[in-house]
Amino acid sequence: MEALVYTFLLVSTLGIIFFAIFFREPPTISTKK
């Protein structure tokens, strides 16, 4: 079950990087709040 662990680590890492960039730079998509 090593593949499952590696997949989880990969997804979690990409998720952290994505959220870091997402919250640092507000998306230009029409955000209506």
UniProtKB/Swiss-Prot annotation:
InterPro entries: PSII_PsbT, PSII_PsbT_sf
Cellular component GO terms, alphabetical: chloroplast thylakoid membrane; photosystem II reaction center
Cysteine pairs bridged by disulfides in the record: none
GO terms classed as biological process: photosynthesis
Function: Found at the monomer-monomer interface of the photosystem II (PS II) dimer, plays a role in assembly and dimerization of PSII. PSII is a light-driven water plastoquinone oxidoreductase, using light energy to abstract electrons from H(2)O, generating a proton gradient subsequently used for ATP formation.
Entry similarity comment: Belongs to the PsbT family.
Record's protein name: Photosystem II reaction center protein T
Top-level taxonomy: Eukaryota, Viridiplantae, Streptophyta, Embryophyta, Tracheophyta
Gene name tied to this protein: psbT
